[in-house]
Amino acid sequence: PDEFAAQVFAALVDPLPRLVRAAVPAMITRRSGKILVIGSASALRGMKRASSYSAARGAQLAYVQAVGVELAPHQIQVNAIAQNFVENPTYFPAEVQANPRFQERLAREVPLGRLVAAREDAQFAAYLCSEAADCFVGQVFPVCGGWVGR
């Protein structure tokens, strides 16, 4: 289990500070920038058999919150979308979506009663990267059809 957790953190957490360190100098020079991390809502709601994954995703979101505050004086906004139940052919291929058991799960666990459309997710991400969202600093936005609140 420890080796698995280390692998998950190496894949999901360790690259994030390197990405920020690479992108931030030019943003500081410009006094402007946006970094939007696409994370997982599993960090916001416990799930069975996903402790290492959820912990790594939680570390990502904690990093976003901290570095967001650190970079805000430079007019750089760092935020995250914590998603689950978003249309994605990798996680939810057509055969999964058509399965009655999956439809029952959506009805039971997701107040929206359906997957969040990829278009909805993309439009929200575009908004967060626009000037209209300059006021958000180190925020984590669940995009999951209400799954986190249940």
Q: Model-flagged regions — what are they?
A:
Residues 45, 126, 137-150:
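Short C-terminal tail/terminal secondary-structure segment
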Residues 1, 34-59, 64-73, 85-86:
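Catalytic loop of short-chain dehydrogenase/reductase
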Residues 12, 34-40, 77-82, 111, ...:
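Structural signature of the Rossmann-like NAD(P)-dependent dehydrogenase/reductase core
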Residues 20-21, 65:
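A short, exposed helix-loop element centered on a Lys and neighboring polar residues
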Residues 1-20, 32, 36, 60, ...:
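Catalytic Tyr-X3-Lys loop
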Residues 73, 83-109, 150:
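A glycine/serine/threonine-rich, flexible loop-to-helix segment
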Residues 110-121:
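A conserved structural motif in NAD(P)-dependent oxidoreductases
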Residues 25, 69-73, 134:
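Alpha-helical segment proximal to the catalytic Tyr-Lys
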